[in-house]
């Protein structure tokens, strides 16, 4: 399903990005690992058959252009993009500076928009491709115990952006979708513990399945949205959250 397909994964040096890169490599794709930490990228790339690594700060316009140009130069095409790089600025809105708010939106929303545009220009000349944006359940609902106005705004924005780009780019054969993860065991959620069955009660109480996400569950969803099995799916936001968005 993914054999030989060239797919950029941003934020690939850790967490979900690393998991997706590993899954893509296992599916026969050519994952292009992009992140700022070159040492971690190189170490991961060495473990993954067919993988490539390009150090990149996605908030830097020149780095974004270099990333796409290097992929085309090395591989001749681009089949997929996973906009995964992101961060939060947890804290009450009244204590958050506008600079902190802007930084989160720059990384979580502006950078995916700009990189998607560059990717789309490359894809439309080769018959299309697939873009998967990593949103969040917090873009669909608020969680009072985790105040983060910047993160919530950015993830709600990426959901709207996903639908708009899907509408605009379908004519080029480019599908744009998103995953909206709940709380999954990863480096980003390390403070919650490494056992998704034993996450804090305030999260489990909001999750009909009464657990966090297990390793593999989220990257399986991303691979589905990138692949031929979702060839008639675009503009969709796939919640992978144990039902949290509906409670």
What are these regions (language model features)?
Residues 13-14:
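Conserved glycine-rich cofactor-binding loop
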